[in-house]
UniProtKB/Swiss-Prot annotation:
Family: Belongs to the RecF family.
Protein name stated in the entry: DNA replication and repair protein RecF
GO biological process: DNA replication; DNA synthesis involved in DNA repair; double-strand break repair; SOS response
Keyword presence, DNA damage: yes
Subcellular localization(s) per the UniProt record: Cytoplasm
Length: 363
């Protein structure tokens, strides 16, 4: 699977551009703030129907326009795909696949998988549990529409429970019990799927991390949850909701459940978030991203497109070399301010595009 070409109209700082991509490596070079990341953002948007940088779609529209348009032509077996997205200033969007309008955004998932690696991904290792949950939810949703449905249902019911907890004069124990039962049903399925995904991440990640560090480090991912057992997760989750009820009423929110869970990342048995060096933290993210590629390939039988947004400059030479030597068979788009030493690691089949204030020239 690879992107054949991309057309943008009034997207971010682009008036109207069309780019034909190499099926192997494409390098987008230019000074900062010229629009390199905007191209990757538009491609990411075609995968999940959302930006990796903002929750406000109106920010994607050129400042003096009312709508933006993205068209991405994809070579994909057994049938090529044309993804077209209109983004409106009022907040709505329209998505078509091969000229057929999608009824819901989840229908887009799995059509076109990408793995994005940007400096912000360090948050997966360094910052709060919410970033790690977001990573899990996004990666699993790409591969399983049912997971996304259950996640949406869980969050809707959670919101209803929290509203009732905060409005004590409307507190209804019978209704809380109904919410607890529904949350246990959907929540247990989320936990099971996350644990399965982390098992795969461990399986792939251990080999990748050992390769990157030349056998000096071992990485391990462990799911962290209030649920102790693994046999009757739904029943245990229901008990946890019941046991936390008084505390939840006092605080006005739900204190247990998959929306509070986390996963640890350990390097040689030491927590990478608290005690890992910056180099170890960067390597952990690199491991996670390349393991994600392998998981997508294993489950979907298709290789995702890899988007590297200004990350090579953040890595030392050995890690740069690992990435650039691992691109065989993966269409890759790389943004950077200059080619520098990248070229010596790449085979001849790559394209270079110069980005200058929303204008693109191939050379």
């Amino acid at each position: 699977m690879y992107i054949k070409n991309l057309y943008l109209d009034n997207f971010r700082n682009y008036d109207n551009i069309e780019i034909d991509f190499n099926k192997k490596v494409n390098i987008l070079t230019g000074n900062n703030a010229q629009g390199k990341t905007n191209i990757l953002e538009s491609i990411f948007y075609c995968s999940l129907g959302k930006s990796h940088r903002t929750n406000k779609d109106k920010e994607l529209i050129k400042w003096d326009k009312d709508e933006a348009f993205i068209r991405l032509n994809l070579s994909r077996k057994p049938l090529d795909k044309k993804i077209e997205i209109k983004i409106f200033k009022g907040g709505k969007k329209g998505i078509n696949i091969n000229s057929i309008k999608l009824k819901k955004i989840s229908e887009l998932f799995g059509i076109f998988n990408v793995v994005m690696f940007s400096p912000e991904d360090l948050k997966i290792v360094k910052e709060s549990p919410g970033h790690r949950r977001k990573f899990l939810d996004m990666e699993i949703s790409k591969l399983d529409h049912r997971y996304y449905y259950k996640l949406v249902q869980y969050n809707k019911i959670l919101d209803q429970r929290n509203i009732m907890l905060r409005n004590k004069k409307f507190l209804n124990n019978d209704m809380i019990s109904v919410y607890d039962e529904q949350l246990s049903k959907f929540g247990s399925s989320l936990i099971e799927s996350r644990i399965k995904y982390l098992n795969k991440l461990n399986e792939k990640g251990k080999i990748i991390h050992s390769d990157i560090t030349k056998g000096k480090e071992e990485i391990e991912f462990t799911y962290l949850t209030h649920v102790k057992g693994r046999e009757n997760i739904s029943e245990e989750l229901f008990s946890l909701f019941k046991d936390s009820y008084k505390r939840d009423v006092e605080k006005g929110n739900t204190s247990v459940g998959p929306h509070r869970d986390d996963f640890s990342i350990k390097i040689n048995g030491i927590d990478a978030r608290s005690f890992g060096s910056q180099g170890q933290q960067r390597t952990s993210v690199l491991t996670i991203k390349f393991a994600s590629i392998q998981i997508i390939k294993e489950i979907s039988s298709e290789t995702p497109v890899l988007l590297l947004d200004d990350v090579l400059s953040e890595l030392d030479e050995s890690r740069q070399e690992y990435i650039l030597n691992s691109l065989e068979g993966i269409q890759t788009l790389i943004t950077c301010t200059g080619i520098g030493d990248i070229e010596k690691y790449l085979k001849n089949d790559f394209n270079v595009f110069r980005i200058d204030n929303g204008r693109i020239a191939e050379y």
